[in-house]
């Protein structure tokens, strides 16, 4: 089942086009990825042609890899443990778990559209090093887990085929697992890009167990209503140069105000989409360091 094109399918499509326009992937790869998301060759070609007409995009294959000298924001990551736990309808969910020595709280980590990667494991371990026992859930557990795919474009396409209701159910099950592993701890959630959108979706679905949430540059679901998550203090993280996601920033603030949730919207200057990912081409060390400190301060205020 393909998602509603007006929501996450559109978001994932725009991510591919943006990667092409920024020169991160070439035309052939962009066409391949758009096709995997269900676009016809004609539509995919027209989207890339619009970038070409604007003087953007790369017909050749660009350089790939992590920017030289990238240092992740925050402390050195604790090691994570691969775990399985009970999910909805007798399904088994996969995840990465990192326990803090003296937990101040517990955090659910939601991955980007590349799945449960080493980068997300690192974020999970860094949060544990900062005092928050953390669990990153693999939202492709039913498909065999992220590790069962050899191509990140296949991961994105697989995520695109899953109904949002299953994602929400799996995230709620992961919160239940956190309750078991971190007894009496207040629980927060953080997600990045696609995962940021998932945090918004979790809040909109209603999750009273959340005491804090921090969606990083994630798309806001249409008609989001956060009344069912009355206990969540929400830190919305945006990037100054991320016009695509920033288009929903005002609506997010309005929805938070309407639900009367404690919240703060922060936009980091001179930073683009995915600026926190130290393995990506848009990594901004200064913005990432500031965002991590802001996140830990937020959790400190609302989790302990």
Task: Please give the residue ranges for each predicted region.
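C-terminal catalytic histidine-bearing segment of alpha/beta-hydrolase fold enzymes
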Residues: 257, 262-304
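N-terminal twin-arginine translocation
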Residues: 24-32, 41-65
